[in-house]
């Protein structure tokens, strides 16, 4: 603050009074007063819930590793690179590995995701932006119902209803594009339904209903503003709806991938077992992590046999964590780009 010059007094100059200094106000994120007992209890409960979730995840991983180590110590093969038949009956010389399980799990999940997400995007945009209200409501209910159907129903439907209908398409793809490894003849007849092709389509149906609500949350004011500026309906969707729902679409895609990675009952019913190595063909059979463990559930009375399958479960657990971490990173990156 600058003091006025005494020489200016009486000289006809207007002297402004000095402005008072603004007081510094500290802001307490928990309020201006001391947190009460109820506030402290709520904070402890919230922190405890977060710690409990982390502790449960760590406990699951530790349990799986603890049960798997004895079996891994008796394994005569490289657990990560062996893809042959599992031999766990002789616990003194066990042979098991996850290479084939990992390949089948990732392949069928990515195939299902590639089929499901474009369809899910189209369904979501149609229901939220184009369909009349009297039609959008019932259709949205039917789409959401896809996520509520039990897996065993999908499995039976896929094997006995969908697979016979896919036989002509499978035969045509094999005949026309059989030179490509993706459509080459697999480990069994192409016209049988127990293949990755059938299982992936069933998985795609199961994970379709993951993005509809994301696009339904777009501000209607933004859409109306775009239309008022002369944009067509598609231009409004492209400039407002799609950018708004991009992050949710990415996270929904990874959520669908996570569900596909862990799907058990439907694929256990559909996929045929095989003793051949996985050839990366859509017309191969095989086992995923989940179906391998579920199929051997009745033989897990021995700690070493159980340990072999729990080791596979540990790998599936870690794979799921990695996928979720990638989803989180992609979601954060997409939001930053959008901003």
Question: Residue spans of the language-model regions?
Answer:
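Membrane-interfacial helix termini and adjacent extracytoplasmic/periplasmic loops
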Residues: 74-99, 155-205, 283
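Transmembrane alpha-helical segments of polytopic membrane transport and secretion proteins
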Residues: 1-49, 327-339
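Glycine-rich helix-loop "coupling/hinge" segments at transmembrane-helix boundaries
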Residues: 259-302
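Periplasmic/extracellular loop-to-transmembrane helix junction in inner-membrane transport proteins
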Residues: 26-45, 65-112, 132, 186, ...
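Transmembrane-helix boundary motif in ABC transporter permease subunits
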Residues: 112-143, 327-336
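C-terminal transmembrane helix and the adjacent membrane-cytosol boundary/short C-terminal tail
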Residues: 212-223, 227, 254, 295-339
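Membrane-cytosol interface at the C-terminal ends of specific transmembrane alpha-helices
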Residues: 121-126, 181-228, 232-235, 240, ...
